């Protein structure tokens, strides 16, 4: 997605670009409960690979864990989506794909962005049984939550903002969320300085 931002001050456009990378929340696997893993991959490597799978993100029905009213480490139906991954090879080598990750309960639109992402290969007799906990997070905490890439460039005397999604959200939704975040931060900054001004006026009176 490419947007003409020639009429927007560069520092505002750059702020939006930074929010795309750092602040727009997306959903990814945060925790993996290993029930059984006899695959060639260690628990740590398998968990890491799963955490990098983009999940279609529902920003309208889920909260960031730190903002959820449950305030529980385990989470609730408003801040965590539980998935399971059960796979076993019997008489031949199989490849386990992201399509094999199934929701434990109804997950709405939340699902792996693509079903064709390979997770692990299993030889006959090997199996994996896992529980996955998918939560909202931000790119500034870990790159697995980075919504996409964003860059500013100039061409033919005009300035453009280019956004490419990793699959969590559509580019247009990413842009809308980034703009909302910039607006909110500006509002918070204004409130902060207004309080400082008010406090200074009271001290000088």
Where are these regions (language model features)?
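Protein-protein interaction/assembly regions in multi-subunit complexes
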Residues: 1-205
């Amino acid at each position: 997605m490419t947007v003409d931002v020639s009429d927007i001050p560069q520092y505002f456009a750059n702020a939006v670009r930074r929010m795309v990378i750092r602040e727009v929340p997306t959903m990814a696997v945060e925790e993996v409960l290993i029930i059984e893993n006899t695959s060639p991959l260690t628990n740590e490597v398998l968990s890491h690979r799963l955490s990098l799978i983009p999940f279609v993100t529902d920003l309208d029905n889920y909260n960031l864990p730190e903002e959820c009213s449950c305030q529980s480490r385990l989470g609730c139906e408003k801040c965590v989506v539980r998935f399971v991954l059960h796979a076993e090879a019997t008489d031949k080598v199989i490849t386990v794909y992201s399509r094999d990750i199934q929701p434990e309960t109804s997950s709405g639109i939340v699902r792996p962005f693509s079903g064709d992402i390979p997770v692990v290969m299993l030889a006959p007799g090997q199996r994996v049984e896992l529980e996955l906990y998918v939560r909202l997070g931000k790119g500034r905490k870990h790159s697995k939550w980075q919504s996409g890439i964003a860059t500013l460039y100039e061409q033919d005397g005009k300035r453009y903002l280019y956004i490419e999604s990793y699959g969590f959200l559509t580019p247009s939704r990413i842009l809308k969320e980034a703009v909302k975040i910039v607006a909110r931060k500006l509002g918070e900054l204004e409130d902060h300085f207004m309080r400082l001004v008010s406090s200074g006026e009271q001290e000088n009176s």
